[in-house]
Amino acid sequence: MIDPSESFEATYAVPMHCGDCTGEISRALRAVPGVQEVTPDLERQLVAVRGIAPPSSIVQALAATGRDAILRGSGEPDSAAVAILESASAGGPPVRGLVRAVQVAPNKTLFDITLNGLPGPAQYYASIRASGDVSRGAASTGPAWHVFEDAVACERASPLGADLCAGSALFVAPLAVQALIGRGFLVGADRGHALAGAAAVGVLARSAGAWQNDKVVCACSGDTLWQERGSARSANIA
């Protein structure tokens, strides 16, 4: 479990137009379990949230107010990671989920796992692999380096198709983010974390800490922040 004293700050880009917007956002987020402080910045179009609530719950709470949100950074510098989980087999949506990791204390990291588009309803099991080599998909990621014993329950119907499910989970592990970077992250139906049961796989990469990412236009594509968000949503990256 995470102690309230092990809170972290995360920043989110959120469209806001006036003081009424900031008030509604603050009220919605303060109702989320684990949220301790909410600080909207109308001029910068950013909302800072401190607490122990997973980023996915913040994004969901903002969506309930009719607003989109983009996680811009979380935790201290060099204390966050992300993995896009792609299908480990042919067929179905190519992207099956997202993992956000935030270190909240020395050798203690929160894993916010969101799955969407996997066969189900079903129970799925997550593990961090020894290797980040995905040249042969899950088969080349090597043995399990760390396993999460509890299942990710995918019990909601996915909007991506019939007989597909969605679900999320919040896990805590005695790990430092520095040790995670470049490792594979696998989700599968096998409780023993065997490669044969792999459903989705990705590679953990470093992500920005709070206030480290103020980009509004992509230097590569020229797309704005919200154009990139639209492309990500189309690809099932929530």
UniProtKB/Swiss-Prot annotation:
Main location per the UniProt record: cytoplasm
Pfam families reported in the protein's UniProt record: HMA (PF00403)
Record key words, sorted: Chaperone, Copper, Cytoplasm, Disulfide bond, Metal-binding
Cofactor: Cu(2+)
Cofactor note: Binds 2 copper ions per subunit.
Coiled-coil region: none
Recorded family membership: Belongs to the CCS1 family.
Function description: Copper chaperone for superoxide dismutase 1 (SOD1). Binds copper ions and delivers them specifically to SOD1.
Protein name according to UniProt: Superoxide dismutase 1 copper chaperone
Organism annotation: Eremothecium gossypii (strain ATCC 10895 / CBS 109.51 / FGSC 9923 / NRRL Y-1056)
Lineage: Eukaryota, Fungi, Dikarya, Ascomycota, Saccharomycotina
Recorded name of the encoding gene: CCS1
